[in-house]
């Protein structure tokens, strides 16, 4: 699948398009009512400048549809949030929204039990995890002019200044590496995703903050090699990055060629210039106006509560939820129906996010939809937020070459210290654990996605990465691996 780049109109043109779409929708609703169809009941309200909430009742389902229309040219910013800012972590969408000062939010991507996102996830340029690198994702650029839908081009390298060693890092904050892989681990993984035992490892400590790479195509950060060893004991991260490969692996000699005290340049890219945040999902529903939603035998494709993100032509961003599993109130949508719903809203691009009992929309301090779990709002791995202004966590664009070797005084910065593992980490709550189990069994959420993958309904099994195949196998065996 090709990557889709959607360019957003700015200024008066975008505003005019936005108002025109709203006017046409009102006229269309009036025409249906006048003709006696009475299928749709539509209510609209202004949330904040550039953010509008539309509530739709479709009597044909019936279905209750909630749509946030976000026009970034009028101040709001689309942002992502990782639950509790750690891996794995579970948190309610409402909690993440309140912590980040959002005006509105929907739940984010699929999560494994415990809360690790199923997909490549990045926040403010910081790569959190790389699982499911063949999957699809949504990414806004920092200047709010482009939006990416499609397959991210994950790439991480470590280049030694003295030895000349160039290491390709295959996974990031996942499980143990395969024999032909080098894995990277940061303190974002806390105690649940740690460097492996029986590995050759190198610990890199930061000597600078992250900065844009050339043409803003990814990021770079100057590090220094603190230690290199092969051992049956796991290497501590100490606020830095640990690169590891099996002691018996094919890449062990290459990793051992790094020299203690050697400057190393870490570079990482999502394949989308200017993108700071990446939120994974599956599958894409619309591509450049083409409906690519499909039907399959898996329950994942059947009627479920749904959450998705789309782009309204070349104008506003759409965050959409559909309630489900409530006969007589809202039954939910199949993937094909969800794609058609985005078409009716005027979208040209759309991506399916975590659904089922995870489906949640939060606006101005309250959940405004009806989550399908008996306990109400589910704990989830991530959220897609609407901020009222600029994202305070985004890095300023820096010129390429600002991290030349030797320009830093070294040592650990305040940011690095903040990443240190807490000596008494917060344990998961009972509700959080139960939410993870519910997601694992939910046909509209993670369990349904992985069952569809394993059955070949979402992606041919031959194209699965080794890491994702392990995840699918673990779900089939009833094992929840960290």
Give, region by region, the residue ranges found by the protein language model.
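N-terminal secretory signal peptides that target proteins for export/translocation
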Residues: 1-9
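Bacterial N-terminal signal peptides
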Residues: 14-27
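Gly/Ser/Thr/Pro-rich low-complexity, intrinsically disordered segments
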Residues: 26-479
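Short carbohydrate-recognition loop motifs
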Residues: 482
């Amino acid at each position: 699948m090709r990557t889709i780049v959607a360019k957003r109109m700015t200024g008066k043109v975008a505003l005019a398009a936005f108002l025109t779409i709203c006017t046409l929708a009102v006229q269309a609703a009036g025409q249906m009512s006048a003709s006696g169809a009475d299928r749709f009941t539509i209510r609209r309200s202004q949330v904040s400048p550039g953010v509008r909430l539309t509530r739709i009742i479709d009597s044909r389902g019936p279905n209750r549809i909630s749509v946030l229309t976000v026009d970034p040219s009028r101040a709001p910013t689309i942002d992502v949030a990782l639950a509790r800012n750690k891996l794995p972590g579970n948190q309610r969408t409402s909690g993440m929204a309140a912590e980040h000062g959002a005006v509105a939010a929907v739940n984010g991507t699929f999560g494994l039990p415990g809360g690790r996102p199923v997909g490549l996830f990045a926040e403010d340029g910081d790569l959190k995890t790389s699982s499911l690198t063949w999957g699809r994702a949504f990414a806004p650029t920092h200047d709010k002019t482009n939006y990416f839908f499609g397959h991210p081009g994950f790439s991480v390298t470590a280049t030694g200044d003295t030895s000349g060693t160039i290491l390709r890092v295959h996974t990031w904050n996942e499980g143990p590496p395969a024999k032909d892989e080098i894995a990277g681990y940061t303190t974002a993984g806390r105690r649940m995703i740690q460097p492996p035992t029986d590995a050759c490892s190198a610990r890199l400590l930061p000597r600078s903050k992250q900065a844009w790479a050339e043409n803003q195509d990814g990021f770079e950060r100057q590090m220094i090699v603190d230690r290199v060893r092969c051992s049956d004991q796991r290497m501590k991260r100490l606020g830095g990055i640990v690169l590891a490969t099996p002691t018996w692996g094919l890449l062990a000699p290459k990793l051992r060629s790094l020299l203690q005290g050697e400057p190393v340049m870490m570079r990482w890219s999502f394949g989308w210039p200017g993108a700071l945040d990446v939120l994974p999902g599956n599958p894409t529903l619309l591509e450049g106006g083409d409906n690519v939603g499909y039907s399959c035998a898996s329950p994942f494709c059947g009627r479920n509560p749904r959450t998705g993100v789309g782009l309204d032509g070349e104008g506003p961003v759409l965050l959409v939820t559909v309630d489900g599993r409530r006969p007589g109130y809202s039954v939910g949508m199949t993937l094909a129906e969800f794609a058609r719903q985005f078409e009716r809203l005027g979208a040209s691009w759309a991506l399916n996010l975590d659904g089922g009992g995870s489906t949640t929309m939060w606006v101005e301090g309250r959940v405004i939809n009806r989550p399908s779990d008996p306990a109400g709002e589910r704990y989830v791995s991530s959220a897609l937020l609407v901020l009222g202004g600029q994202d305070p966590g985004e890095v300023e664009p820096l010129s390429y070459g600002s991290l030349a070797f030797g320009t830093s005084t070294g040592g650990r910065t305040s940011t690095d210290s903040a990443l240190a593992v807490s000596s008494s980490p917060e344990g998961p709550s009972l509700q959080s654990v139960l939410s993870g189990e519910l997601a694992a069994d939910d046909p509209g959420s993670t369990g349904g996605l992985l069952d569809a993958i394993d059955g070949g309904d979402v992606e041919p099994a031959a194209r699965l990465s080794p890491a994702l195949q392990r995840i699918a196998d673990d779900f089939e065996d009833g094992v929840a691996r960290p």
